[in-house]
C-alpha cells in the first residue's frame, strides 16, 4: 500500500510553481495525489484581503486548478473561517465547485453536511449523465464523436464528463449505505 500525499499551496512561490509541483506527480516516488489550496496563508503572504467572492484570489485559484488538471491530480479548496456565516460558507462552497475544486477542507463538523450537499451532483444532473452515456452506448452511436440528444449537440467529451458525474454520485451513495 502506497501512502499518497497532498501538497499545500499556501505561498506565492507555491502558486508560481504550481505546474512544476504538479508535474512532480509523474515521479512514482513523489506519491502526490493533489493540492490543497491554502487561502489564509496565501492572503497573509500576498496581503490580499479575504473578501466574499474572493475576486482577488481567483487568478491564483484557477492557475492551481489548471496545474492539477494538466497532470491528472485532484485539488481541494481551503477552509472557510467564518463559522457563524452559513450563507457565506455555502456560497464559497458553490463557487469552489463551479471553479473546479473537487471538494473543500473543513474546520468544523457543522460544515460537513452543507459541503457534501453542494459537492454532490444533483439528481437531475446524474439523470442527464446516465442518459448521455446510454445514448453513446447505442450501436448506431458507438463510433460517433458527437450526437444529437434532445435537440442538443452532445460530444464524446460530454460522455467522459458524465462518467465522472456518475462515479461521484455512485461513490457518495455507496458511502451512505
Regions found by a protein language model. Give the residues of each.
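Expand to "…catalyze enediolate/carbanion chemistry for C-C bond making/breaking, isomerization
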Residues: 1-177
Amino acid at each position: 500500500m502506497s501512502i499518497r500525499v497532498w501538497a499545500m499551496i499556501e505561498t506565492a512561490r507555491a502558486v508560481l510553481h504550481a505546474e512544476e509541483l504538479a508535474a512532480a506527480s509523474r515521479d512514482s516516488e513523489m506519491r502526490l495525489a493533489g493540492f490543497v489550496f491554502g487561502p489564509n496563508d496565501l492572503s497573509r503572504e500576498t496581503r490580499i484581503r479575504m473578501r466574499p467572492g474572493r475576486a482577488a484570489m481567483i487568478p491564483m485559484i484557477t492557475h492551481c486548478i489548471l496545474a492539477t488538471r494538466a497532470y491528472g491530480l485532484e485539488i481541494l479548496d481551503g477552509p472557510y473561517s467564518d463559522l457563524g456565516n452559513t450563507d457565506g460558507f455555502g456560497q464559497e462552497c458553490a463557487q469552489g465547485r463551479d471553479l473546479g475544486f473537487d471538494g473543500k477542507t473543513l474546520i468544523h463538523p457543522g460544515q460537513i453536511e452543507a459541503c457534501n450537499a453542494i459537492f454532490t451532483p444533483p439528481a437531475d444532473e446524474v439523470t442527464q449523465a446516465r442518459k448521455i452515456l446510454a445514448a453513446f452506448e447505442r450501436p448506431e452511436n458507438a463510433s460517433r464523436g458527437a450526437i444529437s440528444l434532445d435537440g442538443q449537440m452532445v460530444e464524446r467529451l460530454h460522455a467522459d464528463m458524465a462518467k465522472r458525474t456518475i462515479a461521484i454520485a455512485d461513490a457518495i451513495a455507496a458511502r451512505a449505505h
